[in-house]
Amino acid sequence: MNKRILVTGSSRGIGKAIALALAQAGFDVVVHARSRIDEANHVADEIRALGRRSDVLMFDVTDRERTKQQLEAFIEQHGAFYGVVLNAGLTRDAAFPALLDDDWDQVISTSLDGFYNVLKPIIMPMIQLRKGGRIVTLSSVSGVMGNRGQVNYSAAKAGLIGATKALSLELAKRKITVNCVAPGLIETEMVTEEVKSHALAMIPMQRLGQANEVAGLVRFLCSDEASYITRQVISVNGGMH
């Protein structure tokens, strides 16, 4: 049986790197995007070029009903997922007094409602399949340490760590591992030169991370070799803490 993994937020950046790394490791991958359907389709084409199957789903993880409909319909047609990588996230940075209500709500909802909305329709079919499984969430160094100008993002990502650890306890006896990867500053199109120059002073390795370095860890956590690793938060941050 081919093992299929859903990667949310995988049309670009770290999510795309994760999707391609999993395909290279022999997994079939379902690519997800909120709106960038053309980019998601391109990633799916790259996965198929590697000899793996790939489908594309498009929904906003904060929309509970839409997410449920899309995932339940997919599972009914294709069967349960072997794994899920929760990568979809959102930043809206500002000093706390300047945060807008929507800045708080959207960042929290994308990470925490997204966790619930995506996993709720997926977990029971995974359990019923009795084949074990892998769940990996993407937190952040901000969720581990806190970061000025990111009270909303730090809260969201710290909450994700707590949810990950709690869920791992419920699923361990089902041979479904649940782990969290916490990247530091990773070189993506979202990182400005100003942010980069400020951040380098805080990174002992004196460089930004690369998306493939995060993807390599996620790939390992989804592998058979990681079957005894669960409830862990593993940082990829160049020694920031």
Locate predicted features.
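Alpha-helical segment proximal to the catalytic Tyr-Lys
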Residues: 124, 169-173, 227
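Residue(s) in the substrate-gating loop at a strand-loop-helix junction
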Residues: 140
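Active-site helix of classical SDR
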Residues: 119, 156, 164
